[in-house]
Regions:
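N-terminal lobe/hinge region of extracytoplasmic solute-binding protein
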Residues: 44-102, 133, 237
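C-terminal motif of bacterial Sec signal peptides marking the signal peptidase cleavage site
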Residues: 22-25
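Append "and occasionally in soluble cytosolic enzymes with long acidic Gly/Pro-rich linkers
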Residues: 340-441
Length: 441
């Protein structure tokens, strides 16, 4: 049984808003923003706790990805409205559209020739090779790795300073492979990071398994030292639009423009401030006082939207691709496992979840019902049309009664027909057992 509610913003927020002044600063040039007397924007955000572009287990929160992409541009960025093959957003990508061989096994990619690191060093395929060597020799440390998937069954060939190819042993659907496998490739500044200590000279250590493991251990260790982020020279070598200027764990950070950024989407403000809050109430108090430029309205406070807009904020929904669900404990030692192991009970539980009412009353219509994590047809989005187990208390009651239960609304439902037959309660359930569960938060 899963409760799947589509939320409309990432990082646990429900609505986002930008102050009129802040929005102008983000969308106009610096001269115009200076006329408003505001050259910086403050936004509500959980403070990231990972900066190394190779993901690590336990550090894959959304705010980490957003933070890293502001400092390091990806091989491929995407845009749903892009007319480029594979929906690649070329202005924000370091790579051009891949050329796929006729047999579907070789992907040849050319890097932009104008991209460079913040110290002026050109971005090159050596940075691709550096990533490849670190990842393939430290697979067990990479959060995105799954045995049998990329880079397993694949090989890298560096063709020149700006061109490389990846060849697979099997042919895959190019759209899937480019958008879900090759997009994991990250360019890392080999000229600044290929070492095992702060005072060691950079060399080609990554080109041996032992060296790659030592370099990876060093970089990962530095990434775990959050208090050093802003002053560590490692993290000052970036190729994205921003550089880190200040970082206080659990409190916030400040970004300033990367003056050597090569892209067209250069920052239009002088400083971007991420401010962390202890909870929704503290954040929303800052919104109501006008203390931040970009934040969110918690779902429970959505009825205060008009008051927020009266402060000069522009309120808008921010679609988020996520679901909310109940995680069931199937462990044999769990108190309710003998019930959860019964498929018909899980089906009945799903039929007792009133997604439409939850979406309306709890989430203030900032969430919508769904059947599960697989996207629904466009004309069904936001409904339970086509869901196998819609909200249907009568059907849930009948399902339980058909399996030997005495259902008592608002009371204790007990097993009257124990056993493993089709019309019985199921294995491990005894006569008189009450159907109950413990919820953990």
């Amino acid at each position: 049984m899963n409760l799947r509610l589509k939320r409309w913003i990432t990082a646990g927020a429900t609505l986002a808003m930008v102050a009129t002044m802040g929005l102008s600063a983000c969308s106009t040039n610096r001269a115009l923003s200076s006329e408003t007397g505001k050259n910086e924007v403050t936004m509500a955000s959980r403070t990231p706790n990972w900066i190394f572009p190779i993901s690590a287990k336990g550090y894959t929160q959304g705010e980490n990805g957003q933070f890293i992409q502001s400092l390091y541009r990806p091989l491929f960025a995407y845009k749903s409205t892009s007319e480029t093959p594979y929906k690649i957003n070329l202005p924000k990508s370091l790579g051009q559209v891949p050329d796929v061989s006729e047999d579907g096994k070789t992907y040849t990619i050319t890097l932009r020739d104008d991209a460079k690191w913040s110290d002026g060093t050109p971005v090159s395929t050596r940075d691709i090779e550096f990533w490849w060597n670190l990842v393939t020799n430290n697979k067990d440390q990479w959060a995105s790795y799954k045995e049998g998937f990329f880079p397993d069954g694949a090989s890298l060939a560096v063709l020149d300073e700006h061109t490389f190819s990846i060849t697979t042993t099997d042919a895959f659907n190019p759209s899937w492979f480019i958008d879900n496998q090759i997009n994991k490739v990250a360019l890392l500044p080999q000229h600044a990071w290929d070492k095992t200590s702060a005072d060691e000279a950079v060399s080609d250590l990554d080109r041996t398994p032992e060296g790659a493991q030592a370099v990876f251990a060093y970089l990962q260790g530095e990434a775990k030292d959050l208090s050093s982020y802003a002053k560590n020279p490692l993290w000052q070598t970036v190729n994205g639009p921003w550089k880190l200027s200040s970082f206080t764990p659990d409190q916030g950070l400040e970004l300033v423009p990367n003056e050597n950024y090569w892209g067209e989407d250069k920052p239009k403000i002088d400083k971007l401030i991420y401010k962390a809050f202890t909870g929704d109430d503290a954040e929303f108090n800052s919104v109501r006082s006008g203390a931040i430029d970009f934040g969110y309205i918690p779902a429970a406070s959505y009825n205060q939207r008009s008051a927020v807009e009266s402060k000069g904020y522009n309120v808008f929904l921010w679609p988020g691709n996520t679901i909310t669900y109940l995680a069931l404990n199937f462990a044999p030692q769990a108190p309710g496992s003998k019930f959860i192991n019964q498929k018909y009970i899980r089906q009945a539980m799903q039929q007792l979840i009133d997604q439409p009412t939850l979406s309306e009353k709890i989430w203030s219509n900032t969430a919508s019902p769904t059947c599960g994590p697989v996207p629904m047809p466009a004309d069904k989005v936001g409904t339970t049309d086509g869901c196998v187990y819609k909200f249907d208390p009568d059907a849930a009651k009948k399902l339980l009664e058909d399996h030997g239960w005495k259902v008592v609304p608002d009371g204790s439902t007990t097993c009257e027909n124990p056993g493993t037959g089709d019309n019985q309660c199921g294995e491990g359930i005894e006569a008189g057992d009450a159907l109950s569960f413990k919820l953990g938060l």
